[in-house]
Amino acid sequence: MKKVLFETHHLYYWPNFLPVVEELLKRENYVINVSMPKRSSSFQENILNNVCSVTGILFITANTEEERINKIIKEDYDIIIVGNVGQLNQIASSDALVVMVYHGIGLKQSYYNDIDERVDIRSVESVARFNELKDYGHGNLALTGFTKLDRLVTLANESINETRTKLQIDPSKKTVLYAPSFYPTSIDRVCPFLPELGQDHNVIIKLHGFSWEQKKYHYQNILCSELSKENENIHLLANEDFDIIPYYLVADILISDISSTIFEFLPRDKPIIQAQCYNLKLKHRIFKRRFWGKMDLERQDSVDFTYQISEPEDLLGMVYYAIDNMDEMSSNRIEASEFYLYETDGKASTRLVDAIENH
């Protein structure tokens, strides 16, 4: 039996890992452990620990980060799977096979920068990105597709119905999923228009984990919590509800900004509105080049499958238009899904585990 550690740097990495965990468990010759770096707040850790308890997976923790790292080193794992570089070089032995399933596929340059020579296999979500990384000199690539999206195919209809029931979604209304990034974000400028949107639609708000967990973005969950309390058709998903996949499956339309969600929603072949109305930090308003240097502008310029708005006042009209013309951009979305996501057949995790076993 090979020992596998999923080093889950943040809670929102777990949906990327879950299909890989399920595939490893099916093959029956792996012992799986999960861990998360120690932080001042144990909230994320407690949520993930509970998730692991339900599935019978051992969660590795300790009183301090140093103790946790020492525990991991003593376990001497055969395989370590990460979502970013993080503590990789401290926890991986020289004999361990290190696999990266990167946590996001959005519009930030970190996709190309957050890498380390210690990674033996990097799961890549598309042919285009595979060739791009290869041109940069990376030779540790496995073309798999995006593992997170496997459950768009494998999640049972029963689970989808449970999601609708849990939120008490009005079946007579279309459902809008609003899934903004934490920064830069459209939240400040879009939220004032959500109550009016909620008059004729179910509105589900799925915030980024940092909107709950980092103090400087905490105002975002406060703002959205107030909206949810005051409007019966606006449903804010709690921090514990960190898995967005079930909500992709009940949504008729997605609103986002620079989040990976604009790519993740493509297999649903439903309208996507990209709200390009951000409130930038003062330093980025003054030194704009510093901000745009963190963005993948070439990737943004290639996006031709979303309805794009630069002013929040245009949101309501665009939602109504998109819902009345659901198929208008269908061919763009289908082509984009093939370009940005390789195969969306529910087997990305199978291809990754095959690559691990063949390494």
Q: What residue ranges belong to the model's regions?
A:
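Active-site and donor-binding regions of nucleotide-sugar-utilizing enzymes
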Residues: 5-154
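C-terminal alpha-helical cap of glycosyltransferases
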Residues: 344-359
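Catalytic donor nucleotide-activated moiety binding site of glycosyltransferases and closely related
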Residues: 35-53, 57, 200-240
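A nucleotide-sugar donor-handling region in carbohydrate enzymes
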Residues: 118-188, 212-213, 331-335
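Donor nucleotide-activated moiety binding/catalytic core segment of transferases
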Residues: 64-67, 217-263
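Catalytic binding pocket for nucleotide-activated donors in carbohydrate/polymer assembly enzymes
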Residues: 119, 260-340
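A donor-sugar binding/catalytic signature common to diverse glycosyltransferases
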Residues: 80-82, 95-100, 239-287
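Short hydrophobic signal-anchor/transmembrane segments that target glycosyltransferases
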Residues: 20-23, 189-205
